[in-house]
Amino acid sequence: SEMCIRDSLNPKAVFNDGTPIDIDALKATWQIQRDPDGEYKIAAAGIYEFIESVEAIDGDRYHARVVFKTAHNPVKGLLFGGILHPAMLDVNLFNEGFVDNPHPELGCGPFTLAPNGWNSSEKTFTAVPNDKWWGEKPKLDRIVVREMADAAARAAYKNGELDVVESRTLSAYNEMKDVANSEIRRGRRLFAGGMNLNAEHITDVAVRKAIFLGIDRGALAKIRFQGLPYEEEVPGSMLLLGSSQYYRDNYPARNPEEARKVLEKAGYTKSGDFYAKDGKTITLKLTTFGDDATTKGQAQTFIQSMKEIGINFELDSRAQSEFSKVVGNREYDVSISGFGVTSEPTSAAEYFYHSKNWNGVGTPEIDAMVDEMVTILDDAKRAEKCNEIEKKHMSEVCLFIPFLNGPDFKACRPKLANYGAFLFRSLDWSTVGWMA
């Protein structure tokens, strides 16, 4: 029942402090990420919790044998996609040591942090070519990343202070489409966007199920794309884009009448416009981020659709800069946000639908389905099981509501090469440069 993988490393590869990227780095990567309930603050263990051992082959520090407790598929793209420095085995360093300190010596790649390149007060990060990099020399002399609110970023782009700015919302696209010395580079976004329900706040699954049945996802998507040169079918999956051969629409059909019946069956009674139970009206908050008019329109439409089924929602509008804190600490009832999408559904199905990743919220039956799914070797059969899992979770547990994938529009300087909309191709910063 065991599975063995052999992994080869480039002997030229080193971290920025000169530490070799060898068997010790692979072991550290596994040991840090193998236990989601351990000392290290990780979101999910993923493939690493299924590993039994990581050992050098015949003493060769650049060839490793990875033994799994049971079969796990797929492996490509999930195993050692990012390799951690052995120094990060220090729990305090891993959990707290990167606060206001990027530790460039523990990284690697074609670029590294410039001297004095991290400025937390000005919210800038400046990278320069890395002399420890063993690969192709990068084209750029410097990359400056700045944290800015969306409107401020667009203004800075128009003033010549930035070379790239996101332009995928209607207000952003209209503002940027005719800017001089600029072009909109277009593609499809690898994103499952929608509503995320926090089961720690909305503990009654009947309320979550009513939200799933009552939301008008089509209306929310229409608001998002109205006026944009972009169209798509409303997605019914968090796992894949609709263009995938394995995509299935797993979302339950909208049924406001059934949503009200679900609440009444759970003991809620109508008191005025809203349902209540034990003297408490169902009152929740919808958390949004930023000041985009489209997001505000979506929020109001959602709140109205919830009023139609007897659930009272209030708007909790936060600054864009609060996103990581609020979402990371789960300080919301329902949020408008989303997750990245890949070309393969296994890791997403495991992450979204196994209860271990959501403080036990789920069902033993679904957990068993996920545990079985990751052992299936055949890609098509494994994808079929992923869809079965998602369909069941969306009808019984009700945490993630997809209603858009959306466009990937970026305003870029015309002579900026190898940057823009990539779809499934990873951004290779060493190839980004300026055309003559």
Segments predicted by a language model, with ranges:
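A structural "hinge/loop" feature
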Residues: 1, 19, 23, 74-86, ...
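Short, small-residue-biased leader/transition segments that mark boundaries at the very start
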Residues: 3-5, 127
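Surface-exposed binding/hinge segments that line
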Residues: 6-8, 43-93
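Gly/Pro-rich hinge or "lid" segments in bacterial periplasmic/extracellular proteins
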Residues: 80-138, 142, 152, 256-257, ...
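Ligand/substrate-recognition segments at binding pockets and active sites
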Residues: 122, 269-341
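Detector for C-terminal structural segments
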Residues: 124, 215-246, 294-303, 324-436
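Append "and occasionally in soluble cytosolic enzymes with long acidic Gly/Pro-rich linkers
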Residues: 128, 203-304, 388
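Ligand-site clamp/hinge motif
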Residues: 129-175, 303, 312-314, 319-320
